[in-house]
Amino acid sequence: MYGYRRLRSPRDSQTEPQNDNEGETSLATTQMNPPKRRQVEQGPSTGAKKPSISGAPHLNSYQSLELPQNQQDSGTEELMIVLEQGTEVRLSLEEVILILAPETVLQLTLENTVLVIVPEHVLRSEDGLQSPVQIQYIIPSVDDFSLEFHAQDGDISDMRRENVPFSPAEEGKAAPLYQQPLMIPQANHMAGISPSFLVTPLCIPRCRAAFPQCYPLPPTPSPVGRPRPADSSFSLHGMELLCTSSLRPMPPSPSPGPQVYHRVHHRPPSRARRCLFRK
């Protein structure tokens, strides 16, 4: 009949709260244990993936000279060249010649030799280079500098054979400016490089005149004009020869007059000559 409403049994009224409790329990479990799916973070508007950017190196970060593990042995020779601005290094590899003028630190491995080219402005800066040794200057006697690599024994030599390293200063004597070692702060000390490496640093100056000479010449005094004494003044006007002198002035030479040229008349040959020499 219309308007009839079925009464709920006590069993149904007990089942409904139980279902509600199960729904709340499943929702709490879902919040505590989210599904193991890779969720991609999306932006609020574009929906693009948000990249993870690692910290970029600072401009003043140290540049280390750490070598690979297979090269860190006692037989490895390390050759360091310090370049000034505007200079270059020519490396001869048999039939190939490389011209190197880097703006930053450049490291080359040639057989058992490690060639490190360091610009001077990088080495002079406080945060430019890490090195466990003190660098000494070697000033070449020529402006251009060339190296030759021998593929047989793996050695690098100077092609001109004119660059000799300066000996360190003796105790009690101050070394000249160009012989003093380039001190590197202790903060730049880096572990991991064996001190047994043979480090031969070279400095190639662009203008050798900027470095002081080994034996400086004494300064040349500038000439200063001195006044002439009054008794030393003389004049050449009015000087005459003495009468007792054996020298006499020569008479003045006569002025050359006009030259007279006489006219020569040519007469015909005589008849007798014609008769004697007949054809």
UniProtKB/Swiss-Prot annotation:
Comp. bias (Polar residues): 15-33
Stretches for region Disordered: 1-60, 247-270
InterPro entries per UniProt: PRR23
The family this protein is said to belong to: Belongs to the PRR23 family.
PANTHER family per record: PROLINE-RICH PROTEIN 23B, PROLINE-RICH PROTEIN 23D1-RELATED
Protein name listed in UniProt: Proline-rich protein 23D1
Organism in which the protein naturally occurs: Homo sapiens (Human)
Gene: PRR23D1
